[in-house]
């Protein structure tokens, strides 16, 4: 059990430097008073009203610091599994990529949209468990997968520099609220193309696409229990062999069968 689950991003912040995506830390690691979130995120539950204050509300691990942490952990026989929260719990990343879009839109439109995680025309209405209304990546955008692969490749490079092998990346997958993607023209177009009738089923599309991205980069995927639940048999057949681990978190009375259901479906729990 010598594993550190490194949960470096969520709705409230992004806490790891990713070369080439400077906005993730320039914007996504800072919280404070703002009208447009172009320089920092809104304050959250624990405050964070000054984006320049040296408090827990602000800050991030530099690339060098994370590499040092990897080495330190390895010397003590601790394996670190990084998590990229997706497609939900992704508000910090989404806002950061909007800031990137606005920064480059007039001078370099291609660069502006290269890693976009949201669609300006999306009119979907939803509320997450934490009461966010804009924290889910648009899974129909090629730029979403470009973003995910970029982060995965940068993580891989950090592990290599630390003299280690990255085996898996935890992809999150939990708490995608009902109502997402229903008002997205791109998602509706994709659903029609692949024959889906319910927008929420696009979660399956996302995890199968990401499993392929991981495999292409020589990795297996991990995720919360949702990545292994409610799929078609065709999707299960693909995902079983590509999964490194499924983390069952919601096992309160009435849901305690989830662990057995997941294991019986052939996933490593």
PLM regions: where:
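Catalytic domains of carbohydrate-active enzymes, especially glycoside hydrolases
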Residues: 1-11
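Residue-level detector of anion-binding/catalytic polar loops
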Residues: 2-3, 79, 220, 268
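Aromatic- and acidic-residue-enriched carbohydrate-binding clefts of CAZyme catalytic domains
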Residues: 12-75, 90-140, 179-198
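Anion (oxyanion) recognition and catalysis
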Residues: 67, 74, 215, 263-264
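Short secondary-structure junction motifs
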Residues: 75-77, 81, 164-168
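Active-site neighborhood of glycoside hydrolase catalytic domains
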Residues: 125-245, 251-254, 259, 266
């Amino acid at each position: 059990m010598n594993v550190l689950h490194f949960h470096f991003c969520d709705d409230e912040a992004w806490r790891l430097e990713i070369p080439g995506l400077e906005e993730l830390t320039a914007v996504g690691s800072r919280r404070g008073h703002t009208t447009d979130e172009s320089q920092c995120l809104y304050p959250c539950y624990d405050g964070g009203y000054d984006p320049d204050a040296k408090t827990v509300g602000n800050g991030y691990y530099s690339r060098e610091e994370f590499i040092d942490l990897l080495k330190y952990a390895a010397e003590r026989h601790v394996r670190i599994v990084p998590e990229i929260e997706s497609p939900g719990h992704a508000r910090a990343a989404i806002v950061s990529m909007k800031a990137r879009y606005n920064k480059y839109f007039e001078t370099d439109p291609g660069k502006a949209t290269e890693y976009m995680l949201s669609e300006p025309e999306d009119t979907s209405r939803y509320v997450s468990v934490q009461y966010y209304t804009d924290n889910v990546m648009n899974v129909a955008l090629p730029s979403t997968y470009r973003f995910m692969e970029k982060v995965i490749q940068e993580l891989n490079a950090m592990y290599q520099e630390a003299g280690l092998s990255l085996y898996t990346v935890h992809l999150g997958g939990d708490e995608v609220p009902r109502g997402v993607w229903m008002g997205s023209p791109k998602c509706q177009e994709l659903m029609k193309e692949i024959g889906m009738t319910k927008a929420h089923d696009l979660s399956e599309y996302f995890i199968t696409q990401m499993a392929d991205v991981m495999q292409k980069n020589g990795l297996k995927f991990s995720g919360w229990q949702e990545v292994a639940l409610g799929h078609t048999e065709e999707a299960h057949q693909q995902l079983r062999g590509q999964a490194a681990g499924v983390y069952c978190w919601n096992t309160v009375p009435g849901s305690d069968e989830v662990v057995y259901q997941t294991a019986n479906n052939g996933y490593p729990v």
